[in-house]
């Protein structure tokens, strides 16, 4: 069985050409996930699982999305919902409440991959405004 490919981006902040560019660079993705602050219209994100970020003022994207790939339950949420103090604890708690294994989030513009107590935290950073 072929392993599923999940393509994740975040915080493109209105650079809409980047959304298409990512798909061009990764045409064989099984899932395309945007972790918020796309600042895109809904129609632009048709093929994406996309959540609302703190700069997506006019979007009707959901605050969170859950999806399952093989035996893993994923939660997508923009990182501003986790605060700044005890951020990691808040992320783990949110995963536990949602009965998920992996959190895909954005907001900080800083890439991160961390495994904590059996949970996985992933932030792809920003495709256009990295820090």
Segment roles from a protein language model:
Residues 49-51, 85-131:
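Conserved beta-sheet core of the metallophosphoesterase superfamily
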Residues 51-54, 58-99:
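Helix-adjacent hinge/juxtasegments
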Residues 5-11, 73-80, 120-125:
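Active-site-proximal beta-strand elements of phosphoester/diester hydrolases
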Residues 13, 39, 54-56, 80-82, ...:
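Catalytic metal-binding/acid-base residues of hydrolase active sites
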Residues 2-71:
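Core catalytic region of metal-dependent phosphoesterases/phosphodiesterases
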């Amino acid at each position: 069985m072929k392993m599923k490919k999940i393509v994740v981006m975040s915080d493109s902040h209105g650079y809409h050409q980047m959304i298409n560019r990512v798909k061009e660079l990764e045409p064989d993705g099984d899932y395309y996930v945007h972790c918020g602050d796309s600042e895109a219209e809904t129609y632009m994100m048709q093929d994406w699982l996309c959540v609302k970020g703190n700069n997506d003022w006019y979007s009707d994207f959901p605050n969170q999305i859950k999806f399952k790939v093989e035996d893993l339950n994923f939660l997508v949420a923009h990182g501003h919902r986790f605060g700044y103090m005890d951020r990691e604890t808040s992320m783990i708690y949110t995963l536990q409440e949602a009965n998920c294994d992996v959190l895909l989030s954005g907001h900080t513009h800083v890439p991160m991959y961390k495994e904590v107590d059996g949970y996985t935290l992933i932030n792809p950073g920003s495709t256009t405004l990295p820090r």
